[in-house]
Structures are given as structure tokens and as C-alpha cells.
Amino acid sequence: MGLKWTDSREIGEALYDAYPDLDPKTVRFTDMHQWICDLEDFDDDPQASNEKILEAILLVWLDEAE
């Protein structure tokens, strides 16, 4: 079973693992959306995301980066 948009914690952690040298404060949502869809374990409709979901994922990524 793959990652879904509702798995914000797991996706944020996966982004941190995939891009450890990237400062999440500099990331655009359009780029982050693509990176999430490109994650090997991601298995959800790319069009099902929204700003609230991306913000939740970004907050986890920021927390991991600190």
C-alpha cells in the first residue's frame, strides 16, 4: 500500500530523506507537488492534492529539517 495525500507525516519524512540538503523554506509548492508524485512509494491521484495538504506536508518537512 503506497503513500496517499493524507499521509502528510510519512510524505514529509520521505521528502527530507530524498532531499536532505534542500532548505524546505525555499521550496515552491509546484516543485514539491512534483517531487511527491515522483516518490517511489507514492500511490495517489496527483490531482487530489490542494494547498492545505501541501502546507501540512511542508510543516512536517520543516520539522524534520530542524
UniProtKB/Swiss-Prot annotation:
What family does this chain come from, according to its entry?
Answer: Belongs to the IscX family.
The record, for SUPFAM superfamilies, names:
IscX-like (SSF140319)
> One of this protein's GO BP terms?
iron-sulfur cluster assembly
| Record Pfam families | Fe-S_assembly (PF04384)
Q: What is this protein called?
A: Protein IscX
Tell me the function of this protein: May function as iron donor in the assembly of iron-sulfur clusters.
Q: Which NCBIfam families match?
A: iscX_yfhJ
The family database entries (InterPro entries) matched by this protein are listed as: ISC_FeS_clus_asmbl_IscsX, IscX-like_sf
What GO molecular function terms would the record report?
enzyme inhibitor activity; ferrous iron binding; iron ion binding
What start and end residues bound the annotated signal peptide?
none
This protein's assembly is summarised as: Monomer.
Task: Write out the GO cellular component annotations.
Answer: cytosol
